[in-house]
Amino acid sequence: PQYQKSCRLIPQHFREVCIRPGMRHGHYEGWEPAEIRCFFESAVGDGYPPIRITDVSLDDSLRVSFRTGIFPYSAEFYYTNDTLSDNAHRVWHTVGGTLNREKGTFTAPLPQEGFRFGFVTLKDVRLMSVSTEFISPE
């Protein structure tokens, strides 16, 4: 999708993605997430950086590797087969998985019905979120 192309214009060492299904759209709402400040303070100040996703692999399950110096709190795999709705109205489903904090991995089963697009969101103990770029089995 075009969103992915835009994300990849940012150099890898600065690229942080935070996808929020159901987030309202607008100038005020766009600056509402605390992740924006967290990223900015870690990039140019002395703030603690968000979780860093280091690898995504997809075979018989989905596996995301990450590194962080702060306690990873939760992770979910969001997916959709909805290709007709615009982003504001797209229907997303979630799948839980296994978050291995010591190894820095999250593993989730693939949905039985398949999926067209998906992403994983990881949250740290501060509830700061970071997402993978869009994942597609194609």
Q: Over which residues does each language-model region extend?
A:
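Short alpha-helix in the alpha/beta-hydrolase fold that links the catalytic acid
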Residues: 1-8, 80
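Catalytic histidine neighborhood in serine/cysteine hydrolases
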Residues: 10-27
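Surface beta-strand/loop "capping" patches
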Residues: 31-34, 38-79, 94-111
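Beta-strand-rich binding/interaction modules
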Residues: 73-82, 86, 117-120
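Short, aromatic- and glycine-rich surface loops/edge beta-strands on solvent-exposed regions
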Residues: 113-126
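Short beta-strand elements
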Residues: 126-138
